From Swiss-Prot:
Record's keyword annotation contains Ribonucleoprotein: yes
One Gene Ontology term, aspect cellular component: cytosolic large ribosomal subunit
Domain of life of the native organism: Bacteria
Chain segments carrying region Disordered: 1-22
Organism: Tolumonas auensis (strain DSM 9187 / NBRC 110442 / TA 4)
Origin organism lineage: Bacteria, Pseudomonadati, Pseudomonadota, Gammaproteobacteria, Aeromonadales
InterPro entries: Ribosomal_bL27, Ribosomal_bL27_CS
Keyword list, A-Z: Ribonucleoprotein, Ribosomal protein
Name of the protein: Large ribosomal subunit protein bL27
SUPFAM superfamilies membership: Ribosomal L27 protein-like
Amino acid sequence: MAHKKAGGSSRNGRDSESKRLGVKRFGGESVLAGSIIVRQRGTKFHAGVNVGCGKDHTLFATATGTIKFEVKGPNNRKFVSIVAE
């Protein structure tokens, strides 16, 4: 009698939910205080003037104004600032 042994189940087939990271408001846009500017893992962008940093490294506006992205310092770090209106 010919028999075929049952195949094992795959150990793949899982994936995590996407975290929707990235820049939420771009340079030149007007924002209100408290608006989220960047969601990130680690400090890809650093907080500049009128910008706060949450415990998960989310950058948010602490004042109403216009967003400005700039690269500065010896390590060419990217900073996000708010120019108050």
